[in-house]
A protein has these predicted regions:
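Long, hydrophobic alpha-helical segments that serve as membrane-spanning/inserting helices
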Residues: 1-15, 29, 36-209
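Hydrophobic membrane-insertion alpha-helices, especially the h-region
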Residues: 18-32
Length: 209
C-alpha cells in the first residue's frame, strides 16, 4: 500500500470516527433538549393547575365572605348603636366559622409547587396566609373568652353583664363589642388580601398562556 493510500485510509477512518462522535453528540443534545422541553411543559401544566385551583378557591371565598361580612357588620353596628344609646343590649355567644385554613394552599403547593409560581404571586400568597393565620388566632381567642365568660352566664340577669347605674358593660365583658369589630376587620382584611392574590394569579395565568 502506498503512503498516499495509507493516509487516505487513515483520514477516512478518522473522519468516520468524527462523524460518529458528532452524531452521538447531536443525539445526546436532542435527547437533553427534548427532556427539558417536556419538563418545561409539565411544569407549565402543573403551575396552571395550581393557579386555577387557588383562583377557584379565592373566587368562592370572596363571594361568600361578602355575604358573611355584611351580616357581621350589621350585627356589630347594631350592638354598638344600642350600647351607645344606653339600652344595654343582650350579649350572645361569640361564634366564628370559616372554610379557610392556613393549610388550604399549602396542600396545593407541596413538593416544590410554590417554586413554579412568580415571585410576586408567592409574596401575595404568603401575605394572604399571614392574614388568615393571624385572624384565625385572634378569633379563636375571642371565642374562648366567650365560652368562658358569656356562655355559662346567659341565664343571668342583664345586670350581671352591665352596671345598671352607668348602663355600661362591666369591665370583663368589654371584649364583646371588641370581638364583633375584630371579626368585621378580619373579614375586610381577608377580602383585601384575597383580592390582591386573585389579581396576581390572573395576571400570571394570562402571561403564561
Amino acid at each position: 500500500m502506498s503512503q498516499t493510500t495509507e493516509k487516505r485510509s487513515r483520514f477516512l477512518h478518522v473522519g468516520g470516527w468524527v462523524a460518529e462522535l458528532v452524531l452521538v453528540f447531536v443525539g445526546v443534545y436532542a435527547a437533553f433538549w427534548l427532556n427539558n422541553y417536556q419538563q418545561h411543559q409539565q411544569d407549565a401544566e402543573r403551575r396552571d393547575r395550581i393557579l386555577a385551583s387557588i383562583e377557584k378557591t379565592l373566587r368562592e371565598g370572596i363571594e361568600s365572605g361578602k355575604i358573611n361580612r355584611a351580616e357581621q357588620e350589621r350585627e356589630a353596628a347594631e350592638f354598638q348603636r344600642t350600647l351607645d344609646a344606653g339600652e344595654m343590649p343582650p350579649l350572645r355567644p361569640f361564634v366564628f366559622t370559616t372554610d379557610y385554613s392556613p393549610g388550604d394552599f399549602a396542600t396545593l403547593l407541596q413538593s416544590g409547587g410554590i417554586q413554579l409560581l412568580d415571585l410576586e404571586t408567592r409574596t401575595a400568597l404568603r401575605n394572604d396566609e399571614s392574614v388568615i393565620r393571624w385572624g384565625l388566632s385572634r378569633m379563636a381567642r375571642y371565642q374562648k373568652l366567650s365560652d368562658e365568660l358569656i356562655v355559662p352566664n346567659l341565664d343571668q340577669d342583664i345586670s350581671f353583664f352591665y352596671d345598671p347605674a352607668t348602663k355600661k358593660l362591666r369591665k370583663r365583658f368589654e371584649i364583646y363589642p371588641e370581638a364583633l369589630q375584630a371579626r368585621v376587620k378580619f373579614a375586610n382584611d381577608l377580602e383585601r388580601t384575597h383580592t390582591e392574590l386573585l389579581k396576581r394569579i390572573q395576571a400570571e395565568r394570562q402571561r403564561n398562556h
